[in-house]
């Protein structure tokens, strides 16, 4: 596929937040290189190694030596999923930014479907899972989470928490990301919605996690997430801090 948004060559940044993904990150990066090179000649692949303690750092450094379009940003210590996303958005230099996780539960080749949907009438193309290939309890918790936060935050997208997104970098001239935990996705979608950016949606496949384990689905993390969601709801829905004058800095940053 050679066509690009607005029927002209466009720059594309692809990034992966990676934490202990040594079993999957190489295949994800190689697949992303193959897909991105078919979409545009102006692309970069970025891996944000979020303080991994397995062989992820060595693997991604070798990928960067092998592929000229690949570069790596290392966090000396784990900053959390939100911290890794913030680094990825800051590091991206191209007109369009795509990200997904490094655990191979999504296929980077489906970026082509999002790219085709990125017309002049869209600012963000959000993937939504056709079906979720997870254990039953994770599916139930995921659906409950989606319905609860959609109601609390007034969101209408089909899948708030699908980390398979293509967006214009101009979005970050108007929104500022602050969260370092997994609720950064909720923060991002709420702020994008409130800033009146145009959202398109595309179905994507979700695959069984063949390597490693989720950092989200344990009771301690679920409790922490509930607290983070409440704090975010109070800040964005009750106080509407992001819509007050001077609240937008235009750069994602950690707090």
Predicted segment positions?
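N-proximal low-complexity "stem/linker" segments adjacent to membrane-targeting elements
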Residues: 1-34
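Donor nucleotide-sugar binding loop of glycosyltransferases
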Residues: 21-24, 52, 81, 107
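A conserved acidic beta->alpha catalytic loop
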Residues: 49-58, 104
